Swiss-Prot record:
Assembly: Part of the 30S ribosomal subunit. Contacts proteins S8 and S17. May interact with IF1 in the 30S initiation complex.
Region Disordered: start-end pairs: 1-20
Pfam families with a match to the protein in the record: Ribosom_S12_S23 (PF00164)
Alphabetical UniProt keywords: Methylation, Ribonucleoprotein, Ribosomal protein, RNA-binding, rRNA-binding, tRNA-binding
The protein's name in its UniProt record: Small ribosomal subunit protein uS12
List of residues that carry 3-methylthioaspartic acid: D102
GO biological process: translation
Molecular-function GO term, any one: structural constituent of ribosome
Amino acid sequence: MPTTNQLVNRGRTSKVQKQNAPALSWSYNSLIKRSKKMPSPFKRGVCTRVATMTPKKPNSALRKFARVKLSNGMEVTAYIPGEKHNIQEHSVVLIRGGRVKDLPGVRYHIVRGTQDVAGVNNRKQGRSLYGTKKDKK
């Protein structure tokens, strides 16, 4: 327990909150060759590797993921949501924040239905997150 004198001299420092998606908060300025803190909801990138991964202990599956080289120079691992995908090695993708709880090190999601990524086929409910257009009747 600090004394009153110690608190008067130093004061209490507030805890620094850790960011969940740090790659989204930096932008690269190619003119001055320097990164700048400029948060954005999405970032564009190019896939360098597309593969599958097995989840942590109680779960069992083959989860699809991609290594993405972002426009700010960082390389991150992003999850590919939904059934089936058309993402290949040099596909341009858009990523958003949001971790996958049972995949260690995966803190980002790929946005379906934008850039080179197609939406999920034959999806009727919850289409917004999977980039699926409304059916023509």
